[in-house]
Amino acid sequence: MKIIVPATSANLGAGFDSIGIAVNLYLTVEVLEESNDWKIDHDLGNNIPTDEKNLLLTTLSAVLKAKNSSLSAKYHLKMTSEVPLARGLGSSSSVIIAGIELANQLAKLNLTTEEKLELACEIEGHPDNVAPALLGNLVIASTVADKTNYVSSDFPSCKLLAFVPDYELKTVESRKVLPKELAYKEAVAASSIANVLTASLLTKNLKVAGQMIESDHFHENYRASLVPELKILREIGHEFGAYGTYLSGAGPTVMLLLPDDKLNLLTEKINEQNLSGQLYSLEVDSNGLQVKESVL
């Protein structure tokens, strides 16, 4: 059995903790065989556990506990990931979705999509990454009073260009710079911008969406000092025809949305900056969670 989960890019500027898209970088978890102990083979570095301390297996345990279920066996697993760690592309969310599905398959829980999403939001705390990782495409979601509501839609046709800096930025560190509250007038403005962003994405109006993406009041202004590449790449985007540029998740990845015919030009102009990191040309993933050779 093989579980495949896409990376995600959250917030899209003003859609803070609510809007996200799935992109075509993937985490894969393969069940190899039964084993005396849980063991995960991976090449993700020494800081990532290979035993039950791994997020994949702590998630599995949390799901089993929540559903009053258990497993009679332990397994040898293989985990491979194209998703850069701690870069704002939903690496932890992809593992959480994989862990939920691993529990679903091995314990034959027959979870619905809604149940999987509720579990993911309980573990992750907010839906902006886990929802598109599960569902694919564009997802706009809200979790209030332990209930998650969402709208899923195709994303407007465009190219995605992600600059992934060489340094990590943990979400907990990136959240420390955010204010504890916003003034009422600023909150109203921030909300109205997010409303127009949502409407423009759902009506495939990327020109307006790009303007709203870059008008965020919720988080980007506070995080900009942590990711100096954001200002540089946004200016390049303005000069050479991008729809909009935003901080992906908590950063430090910077994502540009652009017309198809601007991809080569913007790639060239960004590479000329000699920034320390990698540039990825990405597409929106429309599948979300996939299971090959399901045991259900």
From Swiss-Prot:
Highest taxon above the source species: Bacteria
Gene Ontology biological process terms from the UniProt entry: threonine biosynthetic process
SUPFAM superfamilies linked: GHMP Kinase, C-terminal domain, Ribosomal protein S5 domain 2-like
Residue numbers binding ATP: 84-94
Main subcellular localisation: cytoplasm
InterPro entries: GHMP_kinase_C_dom, GHMP_kinase_C_sf, GHMP_kinase_N_dom, GHMP_knse_ATP-bd_CS, Homoserine_kinase, Ribosomal_Su5_D2-typ_SF, Ribsml_uS5_D2-typ_fold_subgr
One Pfam family in the UniProt entry: GHMP_kinases_C
Subcellular location: Cytoplasm
Gene3D superfamilies in the record: 3.30.230.10, GHMP kinase, C-terminal domain
PANTHER family: HOMOSERINE KINASE, HOMOSERINE/4-DIPHOSPHOCYTIDYL-2-C-METHYL-D-ERYTHRITOL KINASE
Main function: Catalyzes the ATP-dependent phosphorylation of L-homoserine to L-homoserine phosphate.
Name of this chain's protein: Homoserine kinase
